[in-house]
């Protein structure tokens, strides 16, 4: 945690503990140790949870709100990797290797962030089969997500970028707290996708017309996650075929 957030840390409430997906996978003694070590912080909009170059001290998860994972390139431009909605835990690779962070995590709105101290994280890795399975599933799912992100972003198709980001944010493995309703504004989605709010709105209209999502007050409801993923693949294949014909 950054210094300001670290100073605001506190023990989690029962409701907050109930939202942490991996706790139910632990044996009673493991769960007791984890709960005693867990701390939460109330992050304000713009607060950094972790920053590039800082040593890892916690494994973090989003209890409520919305975070973004990003880095700055040599030109000072920000490149956003993904959003982290409720139920999402991140940085397990960095925690496993005890590395410095290679990315920033920043709150896009007021959020509650949970942190498991690094030493407790490694104790669970060494002693808990359930915890190991959760972390391995996280790593595998995140790898697949980033491979897909690189593939779709190369097509430079705004509608596909919005669809890909939505499919990622509704991922039930990585973000179990989202369900079928994601609390997000169009401006927040624009920050994550790297497009203008107007262009994001156009893409959402297209997706809603295809009955894949529904735009609701304060959020987006997924109607057909598999259909959204299929649309991405079909559109990608059509774009690739068009490029082949042009060549």
Q: Regions from the language model: what does each represent?
A:
Residues 31, 80-140, 144:
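Cyclic-nucleotide recognition modules
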Residues 32-33, 49-53, 173:
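Short loop/turn motifs at secondary-structure junctions and domain boundaries
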């Amino acid at each position: 945690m950054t210094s300001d957030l670290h100073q605001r840390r506190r023990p989690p409430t029962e409701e907050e503990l109930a939202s942490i997906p991996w706790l139910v996978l632990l044996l009673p003694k493991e769960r007791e140790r984890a709960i005693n070590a867990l701390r939460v912080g109330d992050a304000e909009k713009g607060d950094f949870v972790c920053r590039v170059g800082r040593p890892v001290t916690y494994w973090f998860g989003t209890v409520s709100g919305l975070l973004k994972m990003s880095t700055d390139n040599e030109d000072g431009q920000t490149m956003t990797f993904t959003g982290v909605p409720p139920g999402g835990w991140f940085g397990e690779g960095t925690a496993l290797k005890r590395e410095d962070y290679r990315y920033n995590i920043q709150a896009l709105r007021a959020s509650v962030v949970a942190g498991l101290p690094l030493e407790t994280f490694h104790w669970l890795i060494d002693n808990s089969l359930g915890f190991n399975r959760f972390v391995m599933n996280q790593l595998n799912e995140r790898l697949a997500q980033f491979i897909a992100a690189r593939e779709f972003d190369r097509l430079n198709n705004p509608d596909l970028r919005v669809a890909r980001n939505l499919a990622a944010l509704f991922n039930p493995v990585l973000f179990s707290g989202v369900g079928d309703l994601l609390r997000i504004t169009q401006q927040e989605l624009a920050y994550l996708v790297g497009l203008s709010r107007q262009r994001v709105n156009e893409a959402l209209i297209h997706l809603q017309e295809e009955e894949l999502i529904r735009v609701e007050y304060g959020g987006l409801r997924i109607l057909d996650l598999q259909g959204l993923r299929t649309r991405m693949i079909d559109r990608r294949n059509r774009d690739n075929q068009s490029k082949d014909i042009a060549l």
